[in-house]
Amino acid sequence: MISFSLINFSNNLSWDKVTNLIFKLQKRLFKVSYVYDRKKLYVLQKIIVQLNYSRLLAIKLVNHSVFNENLPGVDGYVSLNFYESFELNEFLKYNWNNWIFQNLKKVSLFDNDGKIIVKKVPVISDRVWCYLVKFAIEPVHEALFHPFNLGYRSQYFIYEIQELILLNLSKFSFGSKKRVLKLDLSQNFCINNYSFLMEKLIAPRCIKLGIFKLLEKGFVLEFSNNCIFNKVDFSSLLLNIFLNGIEKLHNCIRYGYFLLFFLNPIDNEKELLSKIYLFLSKLDLKFNISEIELSSIINGFDFLGWHFKFSYKSYNNLCIFPSFDNYNKFLTRIKVIINNSNYGSIIKASKIYPIVKDWKEYHKYSDLFDLNYSLCFIKKRAFKIFKSESKQDFYSSKSLLLKCFSVFNIFNKDLKNLYNKFFKPLNFRHLVFLFNRGGEGFKYFYFCIHCGVILL
């Protein structure tokens, strides 16, 4: 009887129905939390955590999540089979409100810049509990977060940051008269006191105790691409809850650790900095003056690998270029591959193509037609290396060069189209919110938080 029930359970389970059911509950929780009804809010959070569907979906997401490296925890498990996941489901059913975490395993990884960083990897069962809690916490704080907090939301593209900067610095908003104050909170960012985070966190007491136990075990709150919680995004969610409220000090955009304040000619930057220091002192965080950068739009400024500069020739009086550091890192990555004698020309071309494609896709709204970003010198060097190989001649090396660098037809879209597309929704980021469950097979739902009308 037990084996028959298990086989029937595995065959009849539809993950589309599971995601639809959890999505409906999260949408209801979002509306209740926006009105800030505490009683219904806690009841809906407990219903989401106690659902069998949410537990099974959390186990499935942990088992099938693709990381850069399969990093096991202290127990040594990378994934669970069907019987182990079924036992974990039954264990979560009775112990989710009194969860005991195991020790975290220290693992050294390479960062995007080539630096060695130390990460603390939890066990699979602890990751499942974090997924389960995230289902109940994320819609609540999504309704209360500032609309210009773009640090962790997976449904927002990174190009929306360009749209917001264009909105604040275009000629229609007198952007040439404004200044920009850029802050970087990533240096020396260490949280010593978690009591302020527990006060901001909106969840039942049992979930708060579980998160506090996880933080006491040594779980680090950070925005990192190489973190084991890259898909879960639980660390960045808690850190966004911790830093929530800094966007209300002034008109700004926050993406992770980076803040960009837009200052009018009347605004005083010293008063703004005093407000920021006061806010960070309440959070028990240290902040250095070297991490502050004040610049005008005419001189230009760098933000997230882009360089924004005022220009009368462009449509919006604002030009976007790749930043100097971003361009140099891109060139060094290509030069390392070209100058490596262990690879042949065909392997070099296959390794160069995705790097060039990703870089041009990231800067598809930037002005790459300038001579500085035409890549003519690196193309000449690559052609010389390809031609020096005995197996290649002039025509074959020319075809390899075209395969590597000829991806500009797909990208380099007009910045005017981006700006016109930005003004289509009249109630941008105020009444209509976007929920995306991820994946190409799902639809994008826009719905009003007051009347509940769904816009497809």
From Swiss-Prot:
Record carries keyword Cell cycle: no
Annotated compartments: Plastid
GO terms under cellular component: plastid
Coiled coil: none
Pfam family, one: RVT_N
Gene Ontology biological-process annotations: mRNA processing
Top-level taxon in the UniProt lineage: Eukaryota
InterPro entries for the chain: RVT_N (IPR025960)
Entry keywords, A to Z: mRNA processing, Plastid
Record flagged with keyword Iron-sulfur: no
Protein family membership: To group II intron maturases.
Function comment: Could be required for group III intron excision.
The protein's name: Maturase-like protein 1
Lineage: Eukaryota, Discoba, Euglenozoa, Euglenida, Spirocuta
